[in-house]
From Swiss-Prot:
PROSITE patterns (alphabetical): SHSP (PS01031)
Keywords (A to Z) from UniProt: Mitochondrion, Stress response, Transit peptide
Annotated gene: HSP26.2
SUBUNIT field: May form oligomeric structures.
Localisation: Mitochondrion
Residues of the sHSP domain: 139-248
Targeting signal (transit peptide) range: 1-32
Descriptive protein name: 26.2 kDa heat shock protein, mitochondrial
Family: Belongs to the small heat shock protein (HSP20) family.
Inducing stimuli: By heat shock.
Amino acid sequence: MASTVALKGRPLATLLRQLLAADAPPAATGRPVAAAPAASGKPVTAPAAATATNAASRRLYNTEGAPLRRYDVVDESGTDSGDEYDATDDGRRLTVPFFFSASDVLDPFGAPTSLGRLLALMEDAAVATAAAPGTNGLATAAARRGGWWVAKEDDDAVHLKVSMPGLGKEHVKVWAEQNSLVIKGEGEKDPEDDADAAPPRYTRRIELPADAFKMDKIKAEMKNGVLRVAVPKLKEEERKDVFQVNVE
């Protein structure tokens, strides 16, 4: 004999439809999802709280909207380095690396930055700049603050160009030690600055393999707040760490 299981006068099938409708996700438009009609003939909708929660989740991961104007850089240690990435006028990222941190927290005797990493950053910046129409090279974004740099490599040398605003030739020291190129500058405090303001300081160590460069032939020139450094390369026949292998 056929029988119907009911709870408080309502068929079990109706209760199951209501439970399934309550667990159903909202549609992409944010409107509730209608389920099969209940016994009353009215559609069953998801609870308002569940709909609001799902909508908030979609907003959390939705990055469309007003473009960001500043990008903080987190270094390899996981801390904010103080460096910035500027955005183009239409909000697209323009990756212009900065040679020095804004607060000069770099330890002159700490771990040096490898030359390969600097050149890789420069290549990435050049690609990003070329892909962003309406910009005038690296100078467009970099001119907004000091500490920008340009690095390039040719067959004869590696060339660095570093912005050190407020400093003159007498404020800058460049030397090579223990396979590293050290660039250090410290300017004079501006009398118009606040009492707590520190004078401009710049420090950077770049790792250079001494067996690939002429460390005693490095040249540096400071002019109009821009330091230019040329590190000549050793020719392959001059390198003592390169040994040709005869192929038989």
